[in-house]
């Protein structure tokens, strides 16, 4: 599920636990910024409960500024996630852009189990999930004129509540000790 909301960020792109700025373009002074902060989660499961989803709900703030004379046509924002080596793109937003300077926010929601990023066993064992936001600004011909990435890592843990066996079982009986002589 994807929701798109364009907002004026002002100085908000500089806020967040992780901020990356990379200006990569043919013109030397093109700039792009992303802000991303991801919180971890911990949950206790009942004895009979199973993990059905791990949902990444994320808002990515972005901004870019290209030099005069450079005309962008498309802004692409991607969200990728992974545990361990490698990241998998779990959501993408693409929108037209005709302005040399723009900023906004993209909201994404993705199930990391459904997309194959995580397994329920990984979550039960506890896993650090890396989330990466990517921004690309392209021209009509597909040339990338500005891009940036921002990354954050958050723990995900689901523990099964322990069962107190003394609550569910009992033992008893009667007996005697006797001495026998041969």
Question: Model-found features: residue ranges?
Answer:
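Terminal disorder- and signal-encoded targeting elements
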Residues: 1-182
């Amino acid at each position: 599920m994807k929701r798109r909301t364009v907002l004026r960020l002002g100085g908000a792109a500089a806020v967040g636990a992780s901020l990356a700025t990379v200006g990569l373009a043919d013109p030397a002074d093109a700039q792009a910024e992303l802000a991303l902060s991801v919180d971890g989660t911990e949950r206790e499961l009942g004895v009979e409960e199973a993990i059905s989803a791990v949902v990444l709900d994320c808002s990515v703030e972005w901004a870019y500024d290209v030099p005069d004379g450079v005309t962008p046509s498309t802004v692409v924002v991607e969200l990728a996630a992974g545990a361990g080596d490698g990241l998998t793109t779990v959501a993408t937003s693409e929108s037209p852009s005709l302005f040399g300077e723009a900023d906004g926010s993209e909201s994404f929601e993705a199930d990391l189990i459904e997309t194959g990023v995580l397994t329920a066993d990984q979550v039960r064992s506890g896993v650090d999930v890396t989330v990466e936001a990517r921004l690309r600004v392209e021209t009509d011909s597909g040339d990338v004129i500005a891009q940036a990435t921002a990354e954050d890592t958050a723990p995900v843990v689901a523990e099964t509540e322990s069962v107190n066996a003394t609550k569910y079982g009992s033992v008893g009986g009667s007996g005697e000790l006797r001495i026998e002589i041969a």
